[in-house]
Amino acid sequence: MRLDRRALYALVLLLACASLGLLYSSTRNAPSLPNPLALWSPPQGPPRLDLLDLAPEPRYAHIPVRIKEQVVGLLAQNNCSCESKGGSLPLPFLRQVRAVDLTKAFDAEELRAVSVAREQEYQAFLARSRSLADQLLIAPANSPLQYPLQGVEVQPLRSILVPGLSLQEASVQEIYQVNLSASLGTWDVAGEVTGVTLTGEGQPDLTLASPVLDKLNRQLQLVTYSSRSYQANTADTVRFSTKGHEVAFTILVRHPPNPRLYPPSSLPQGAEYNISALVTIATKTFLRYDRLRTLIASIRRFYPTVTIVIADDSDKPERISDPHVEHYFMPFGKGWFAGRNLAVSQVTTKYVLWVDDDFVFTARTRLEKLVDVLEKTPLDLVGGAVREISGYATTYRQLLSVEPGAPGLGNCFRQKQGFHHELVGFPSCVVTDGVVNFFLARTDKVRQVGFDPRLNRVAHLEFFLDGLGFLRVGSCSDVVVDHASKVKLPWTAKDPGAETYARYRYPGSLDQSQVAKHRLLFFKHRLQCMTAE
């Protein structure tokens, strides 16, 4: 018995040593762990680019500064790169980062040509999307001029009163004078004050002068700006000056946002929300009609009259018999995101719930909770959780970011698990950037982002990348849908449709769809690489 115990102890010790050896082997080339208190540590390797923004003004050049490397490291370096981390063995207690170099989807000659074309398209995009409202303006110190910092807006070819203009001059002067200058519009006054001289009414440059400061300020309250150049969404940087002082502020020139409202619906007795009137369930199916019928049957247990929209690109489509199902057929193998676009295009309700065709509704699939979140918060989309046959449920909460790269190389896309913060008022919900393939969203917002039909095989997070900075995304772990089991019992008959589905859904290593996706991301989003952890 004693020998058996000794053998057991020796075996445990041997396993422990082996584990430590594997840990050392996988981490000996990795950078050392950062200080727990540090948010960032400078990367090992080539020195970073000089930060020109830290250069002093000439009058302050003689003053020494001690640079705080940890804080400087938090600033954009405009020189991003993607590197895998965590060693070759996927140990559960080590941070794993997978990196993909999108440039590998091109040969050298093609990469040079496509990079030039991409940069040309990028510059054209900047010209279209930027306006003077994006220009940095610095307010001067101790200026006697009072003016609006922001919030001045006019519709194209319309006129407004300009609020907040005033001269707060402390010294007594014989004549108080101010000047206004614009580039996309003209100045005028809605009324004339006796004792104030106006020069340039109806012109881009207007001068106002008076020996009485109060009269000048009363006249400034009546100044109007008129948009004279039709541009649907731009800004005019205007100048406001007096003797020895000049300031600039922007006047936004754009149409006000046009609302897309949905009429309120009557509530069923005792219900908080009329789900059938508020929500349409959308799905994309391909060959798996047994799974699709199981999904529909599970939905009908809890929501018997909610509309279900199906986009179907199967080779031999089968009819679905249900009075509240809209079944739309597509060319065979048209694609995953193309089907999403078709399904969402037919939704007429305020919200659309996206589900996979192999999901199963249960008592925990409470759409009322997701509707409540969107009704009471500014979120545009909220995901739930998907429960596997093992009992494990995932929300697939993802934090997404794009870091600037060196000129001409493109940016770096970062993806990691997590969330930004909890959603106030909803204890099981958080704010994040990407969620699992089970979400409720505002229909008009999903349409504005859209699903790129060029992604026809495997895609999901690309939708959230397209919506990054536009879609406000949340996730709730207490609204759960089941995922049908993928386990194939050996005694069941072979399903030719399932084999065809697997070839399309899970492309092999030699399949070109993954390369095509990398080429698309390289050009479309001006990316050079991406990492996931």
Swiss-Prot record:
Loss of function: phenotype: No visible phenotype, excepting a slight decrease in neural conduction velocity from the tibial nerve to the somatosensory cortex. Mutant mice display impaired motor coordination and balance. Sciatic nerves from over three month old mutant mice show signs of Wallerian degeneration, with redundant myelin, degeneration of myelinated fibers, axon dysmyelination, and an apparent decrease in the diameter of myelinated axons. The distances between neurofilaments in myelinated axons from over 3 month old mice are shorter than normal.
Pfam family, one: Glycos_transf_2
Membrane topology: Single-pass type II membrane protein
Record topology, Lumenal segments: 26-533
GO molecular function, one term: acetylgalactosaminyltransferase activity
A single BP term in Gene Ontology: lipid storage
Disulfide bond annotation, renumbered to this chain: 429-476
Domain of life of the organism encoding this protein: Eukaryota
UniProt keyword terms in alphabetical order: Disulfide bond, Glycoprotein, Glycosyltransferase, Golgi apparatus, Lipid metabolism, Membrane, Signal-anchor, Sphingolipid metabolism, Transferase, Transmembrane, Transmembrane helix
Catalytic reaction equation(s): a ganglioside GM3 (d18:1(4E)) + UDP-N-acetyl-alpha-D-galactosamine = a ganglioside GM2 (d18:1(4E)) + UDP + H(+); a ganglioside GD3 (d18:1(4E)) + UDP-N-acetyl-alpha-D-galactosamine = a ganglioside GD2 (d18:1(4E)) + UDP + H(+); a ganglioside GM3 + UDP-N-acetyl-alpha-D-galactosamine = a ganglioside GM2 + UDP + H(+); a ganglioside GD3 + UDP-N-acetyl-alpha-D-galactosamine = a ganglioside GD2 + UDP + H(+)
EC number: 2.4.1.92
Protein family according to the UniProt entry: Belongs to the glycosyltransferase 2 family.
Designated name of the protein: Beta-1,4 N-acetylgalactosaminyltransferase 1
Organism from which the protein derives: Mus musculus
Species classification: Eukaryota, Metazoa, Chordata, Craniata, Vertebrata
Name of the coding gene: B4galnt1
